């Protein structure tokens, strides 16, 4: 890791507004870090606010001249660990992880999962003048990864994120977690093993030689068409046979294309809904914002956000979130029914 060297600004930190300005520069990347730790956009917001309060309160305790960024990461990580410790949903999963009980751990128990707008990830991308700015790659933010790391113990999760995602050294990670290097290496080894068990071998989204941009555009066009017509047969043509469907915060998972389509038909998809879909992106994945025509026939009301997972040119996963997430995506609550 090449920590951002904030020591040059140390002399200004006696001026409280200057200290606030300094830590605010790290808000975006700390929010992404807390989101990875917690899997929830809302909980990440709270954790960052808590971390900034702690940083402000204990700003005099930071060693003079020490880099600010690692210190803030330590505070933010501890804030996340406190959130996990207070949440019975999370502690039940982490207790099973501590016991090595894979049977008791399942992705459908991660009911607090929330999507992250791509538009809010862009400010952390590096610029030539900021070589240490965060790069948020798909592999480190996609929902499949975020879900599985919620099954890790808190220490395993933190070690994996700091070491494998952020690229920190074992010593730097040990300093953040206030444990030995041996403890970090052990937690990382166990965390990696869990990821290998729960995440299948990563395959390309598209076959070799396929224009991925054009192929994704065509796949999404068919998905939108199938949703708006509606057309169950067209749905069937774009969804993989072993695809999965989840609806956080509801528990449970629907496995298999036939089961998914049957569930949607039983829910009135082909009879009582008239949808309009807007393309967006979440977690570096394509997403559809779905609106359903209201009883007045004049307005489409926000219904759900579908985040799409693609594997080898087919839809392998759909995770549906409630319309409460629309605002953070900059999506309107309703659309006019216009020709």
Where are these predicted regions, by residue range?
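Structural recognition of an alpha-helix C-terminal capping motif at a helix-to-coil junction
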Residues: 46-53, 66-78
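Helix-turn-helix DNA-binding module
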Residues: 154-155, 162-183
């Amino acid at each position: 890791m090449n920590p951002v060297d904030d020591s040059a600004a140390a002399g200004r930190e006696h001026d409280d507004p200057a200290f606030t300005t300094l830590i605010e520069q790290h808000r975006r990347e700390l929010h992404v870090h807390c989101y990875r730790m917690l899997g929830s956009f809302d909980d990440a917001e709270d954790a960052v606010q808590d971390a900034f309060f702690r940083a402000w309160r204990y700003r005099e305790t930071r060693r003079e001249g020490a880099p600010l960024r690692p210190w803030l990461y330590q505070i933010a990580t501890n804030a996340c660990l406190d959130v996990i410790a207070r949440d019975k949903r999370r502690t039940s999963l982490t207790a099973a992880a501590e016991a090595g009980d894979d049977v008791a751990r399942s992705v459908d128990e991660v009911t607090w999962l929330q999507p992250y707008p791509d538009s809010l990830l862009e400010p952390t991308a590096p610029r030539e003048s900021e070589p240490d700015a965060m790069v948020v790659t798909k592999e480190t933010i996609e929902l499949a990864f975020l879900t599985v790391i919620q099954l890790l113990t808190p220490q395993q999760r933190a070690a994996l994120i700091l070491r494998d995602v952020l690229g920190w050294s074992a010593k730097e990670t040990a300093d953040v977690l206030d444990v030995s290097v041996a403890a970090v290496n052990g937690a990382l080894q166990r965390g990696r093993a869990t990821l290998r068990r729960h995440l299948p071998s990563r395959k390309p989204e598209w076959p070799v030689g396929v224009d991925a941009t054009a192929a994704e555009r065509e796949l999404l066009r068919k998905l939108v068409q199938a949703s708006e017509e509606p057309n169950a047969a067209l749905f069937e043509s774009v969804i993989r046979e072993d695809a999965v469907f989840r609806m956080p915060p509801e528990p449970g998972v629907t496995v298999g294309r036939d089961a998914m389509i049957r569930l949607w038909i039983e829910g009135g998809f082909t009879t009582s809904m008239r949808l309009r879909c807007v393309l967006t992106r979440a977690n570096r994945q394509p997403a559809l914002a779905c609106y359903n025509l209201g009883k007045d026939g004049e307005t489409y009301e926000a219904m759900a956000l579908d985040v799409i997972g693609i594997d080898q040119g087919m839809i392998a996963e759909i995770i549906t979130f409630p319309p409460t997430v629309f605002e953070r995506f900059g999506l309107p609550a309703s659309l006019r029914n216009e020709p």
